[in-house]
């Protein structure tokens, strides 16, 4: 049951300095367009090319969809607010944004772990890859990703909706996220904080450890490669993947592992930008555009568009 007496929230945005609004607007617009178009290109390439049918490309397609939902649920509203100075969001709109963002956050973390496992099987058991990562396994893994993400998002959104917001209603952030909403609550938030800790430990820290374990086995397998060029290419791919994963998990763990009383929103807004915009922009470049088959698929898309 919703006990809220607040019908809308005021979003302060990234900065209160008017002279920086133009620069921030342009930066976020460009990065959002790069993220959106990059991920959309992956989706089109996967759908258009029948050769991209292995589980890895299904996971990349799913990651692209998740990244588009993550950025689109936040950035357009933020840019619109900066253009019109209409910095309010309805209670329902705020809860919807929170649900979509929390869903994408959970889905992305579990997807990173799933993709790391897929690469582990492909590199460490190449002869058995098609047997292990068959259609049923792929469907099961994707179902697990969606189930965990939806459950995580539903629980956190429901716990936020049970809180009483009686004023003030000003969110010192650029979107509706759990920490700033907890800071506005007039009712106890202990249960919310406990569930955030549980989710952070199981999803963020747990998935990060599992992902690192998979890449650890991959690195051991790479060390057995005899050619220097083969090792170099494999290490280059692994290091870029681990960089993106670390860049994503670190700010998420940092943001959600602390009690609400310790939040410093000026700093946390910059940290949030890493996992809401920077990582979704880097994902296509690191995971897809370096792949030869995906490059060939993208070239086919551009060739089709020319005709």
From Swiss-Prot:
Membrane topology label: Multi-pass membrane protein
A GO CC annotation given for this chain: plasma membrane
Domain of life of the native organism: Eukaryota
S-S pairs: 94-186
Keyword terms, alphabetized: Cell membrane, Disulfide bond, G-protein coupled receptor, Glycoprotein, Membrane, Olfaction, Receptor, Sensory transduction, Transducer, Transmembrane, Transmembrane helix
Topological domains annotated Cytoplasmic: 44-51, 118-136, 215-234, 290-307
Extracellular side: 1-22, 73-96, 158-194, 256-268
Transmembrane parts of this sequence: 23-43, 52-72, 97-117, 137-157, 195-214, 235-255, 269-289
Any one biological process term the GO annotation gives: detection of chemical stimulus involved in sensory perception of smell
Cited InterPro entries: GPCR_Rhodpsn, GPCR_Rhodpsn_7TM, Olfact_rcpt, Olfactory_GPCR
Pfam family, one: 7tm_4
A GO MF label: olfactory receptor activity
Residues modified by glycosylation: 2
Main location: membrane
Subcellular location: Cell membrane
PANTHER family cross-referenced by the UniProt entry: OLFACTORY RECEPTOR
Function of the molecule: Odorant receptor.
Family membership noted in the UniProt record: Belongs to the G-protein coupled receptor 1 family.
Name of this chain's protein: Olfactory receptor 13G1
Organism: Homo sapiens (Human)
